[in-house]
From Swiss-Prot:
GO cellular component, as recorded: nucleus
Comment field (misc): Present with 37600 molecules/cell in log phase SD medium.
Start and end residues of each SAM-dependent MTase PRMT-type domain: 20-322
Single GO MF descriptor: histone methyltransferase activity
Full protein name: Protein arginine N-methyltransferase 1
Any one biological process term the GO annotation gives: chromatin remodeling
Length: 348
């Protein structure tokens, strides 16, 4: 294969659902790619993982799922891959073609436009899959489904997936001022009662940066996925958690984040990164779920709960999330401060 080739899309966009069209169109503009490229935690982690495993990439066929501007494809080609196939549905792949040619990788990288399920790969099997598929709360936009499709249809037995391990974590947080501002605003809007908006506001998780000192409980690992073995059905999950208050404080909700781990040569520490409040900033930030009530916690009080996550029935790239919890408080007035409640949320 001697020429980078982007032909007409293998997928006819007009035949996609409106939500699918909106999703792919959102990646047409350079701005979203600029934000991802400038996320050095994200981009350098991929580069460093490829460099650490350059012996494994040498002379291998690599599939880049959702290649965007082609940065991961070029990392792989630069560090020894025999050939890289980049697949993307959005029009940004036209720019990727220009970038690949400009940087001298036309003979090593083939770009295909379309959904992975629709394109025809120039090789029957690949040795390595690379993909930056993660969304907010890890699973939002459900691109992991496509990576698993690539694994099941194209990856050789014993092939590698970069990254291959991921986990979702959560902790309690104090965020009274911001929560009050968001909710109290609707009590008096230019002299009118707009309080019916309050449940709608609570129903929507917030993606934002949480300061480390706002986290006021222990953390817990909600779930872990191994991309070598996980099934699409596993991505709809139910998981229990337990958190313990680390100080006397209000607990207004939970903050969630995810951790990522790449394969590593035997005896080497793997490249990994976290998107939590304790870690350097990433464009994924954190995802906040406000509780229906505020918990008045003393040191050692506990929250035990269950989080249920599933694709939304109208748009499977959105997520339905339900959090039920039991807050048990100690002390003289512990009974009056204890709570049992649940909240339902939609990430869209």
């Amino acid at each position: 294969m001697s020429k980078t080739a982007v032909k007409d899309s293998a997928t006819e966009k007009t035949k996609l659902s409106e939500s699918e069209q909106h999703y792919f169109n959102s990646y047409d503009h350079y701005g979203i790619h600029e934000e991802m490229l400038q996320d050095t935690v994200r981009t350098l982690s991929y580069r460093n993982a490829i460099i650490q495993n350059k012996d494994l990439f040498k002379d291998k066929i690599v599939l880049d799922v959702g290649c965007g501007t082609g940065i991961l494809s070029m990392f792989a080609a630069k560090h020894g891959a025999k050939h890289v196939i980049g697949v993307d549905m959005s029009s940004i792949i036209e720019m990727a073609k220009e970038l690949v040619e400009l940087n001298g990788f036309s003979d090593k990288i083939t770009l295909l436009r379309g959904k992975l399920e629709d394109v025809h790969l120039p090789f029957p099997k690949v040795d390595i899959i690379i993909s930056e598929w993660m969304g907010y709360f890890l699973l939002y936009e459900s691109m992991m489904d496509t990576v698993l499709y690539a694994r099941d249809h194209y990856l050789v037995e014993g092939g590698l997936i970069f990254p291959d391990k991921c986990s979702i974590h959560l902790a309690g947080l104090e965020d009274s001022q911001y929560k009050d501002e968001k909710l109290n605003y609707w009590q008096d809007v230019y002299g009118f009662d707009y309080s019916p908006f309050v449940p709608l506001v609570l129903h929507e998780p917030i993606v934002d940066t949480v300061e480390r000192n706002n986290v006021n409980t222990t953390s817990d690992k909600l779930i872990e996925f191994d991309l070598n073995t996980v099934k699409i059905s596993d991505l709809a999950f139910k998981s229990n958690f337990k958190l313990t208050a680390k100080r006397q404080d209000m607990i207004n909700g939970i903050v969630t984040w995810f951790d990522i781990v790449f394969p590593a040569p035997k005896g080497k520490r793997p490249v990994e990164f976290s998107t939590g409040p304790h870690a350097p900033y990433t464009h994924w930030k954190q995802t906040i779920f406000y509780f229906p009530d505020d918990l008045d916690a003393e040191t050692g009080d506990t929250i035990e709960g269950e989080l249920v996550c599933s694709p939304n029935e109208k748009n499977n790239r959105d997520l339905n999330i339900k959090i039920s919890y039991k807050f048990e408080s100690n002390g003289i007035d512990g009974n009056s401060r204890s709570r049992k409640n649940e909240g339902s949320y939609l990430m869209h």
